[in-house]
Amino acid sequence: MMAKAIKNETELEGMREAHLMDGVAMSELWWWLEKQVREGNEDLNEFNVGEKVSSLRAEQAGYVEESFPSIVGEGPHGAIVHYRATEKSARKITKDSIILLDSGGQFLCGTTDVTRTHHLGTPSAYEKMCYTRVLKGHIALDTATFPVGTPGMALDTFARQHLWSAGLDYRHGTGHGVGAALNVHEGPQSISPRWGNTTPITDGMI
């Protein structure tokens, strides 16, 4: 498992290339989504946004398929772990919407899994506070210095500390391994509060 989890330089370069192409598709998606909202598209909903992000990824060179079904959650649906919109359940998306988009692609060179949260209008003070605390957690984790052999369980606290100080939390892991043109969820490493999560986070892991 560890031999697969620790990527070689060819795999790492392929993953960088995959994320560049994925980034193009995601940028196009958010531009399109904001345009639809500005123009007042009343048919805009979670389901057709999921279809749109898949079609934009498919335009990229070396695209194979989705790495998992896209998760598009508007408002309260964004808090449902692994939510999947259907044509019947899909909530409308408007200028007042907070959108969570969790999606990814399988490319010949690598695999992506990207989660982003956007407000399409003017967020409330509480929404800004929550978003800022999550962002501060991302920055704390990204800039953390830790000794060799530190497991993801210990690092998870960096991501949650600013939420905890406000009495907030999220019932989900912070991060998981991603395969190089393989499974989008790859172990044994993860960054989560699970006590059995003792695999050290090592150079070359994604």
Segment roles from a protein language model:
Residues M1-I206:
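Active-site neighborhoods and metal-handling regions in enzymes and metal-associated proteins
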